[in-house]
Amino acid sequence: VEAVEMLVRLRLRPGIGRVANAALHVLGVDFPASVRVGPGLALPHGAVGLVVHEDTVIGANVKIYQGVTIGRSDTHLTGARADGGRVVVEDDVVIGAGAVVLFRSGSTTTIGRGAVVGANAVVLRSVPPGEIWAGNPARPTRRSEPSS
């Protein structure tokens, strides 16, 4: 588990970055070097099957489980119509196994600070800070309890 987190950090270093990216791909992890990541990223269970869009921003102390997809909902668009947009994952967020977090071109989907996205949830719009969302499509279920 810690090895995958180390590879994610190493992917930005000259020289070793190519080796780290190749190792991530062998492990089934697509985590482009362009993804901005804050400190304390946790990828439990080796993050097998993790796919992260190249324009994603991930805050501090975020936990992302295996099989998560963060990307565009309108992948059929090309050219100028597909420009812009991203997912922003703020600090202290947990994204459960198999969850899908999507944005539309030209827009931003934000997972607010301290929010929890349940396992296998499909998030199609921004999640306010401190809320727990689950289901397909994902909807708020309750407020998360602040960690002590």
Residue ranges and their predicted role:
Residues 27, 33, 38-39, 44-45, ...:
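Left-handed beta-helix
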Residues 49:
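Short hydrophobic/aromatic beta-strand element in the GNAT-like acyltransferase core
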Residues 22-24, 34, 80:
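Short solvent-exposed loop/turn micro-motifs enriched in small/polar/acidic residues
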Residues 76-83:
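Extended, positively charged loop/linker patches that create polyanion-binding surfaces
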Residues 1-29, 130, 136-148:
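Terminal amphipathic alpha-helical/low-complexity segments used for targeting or macromolecular assembly
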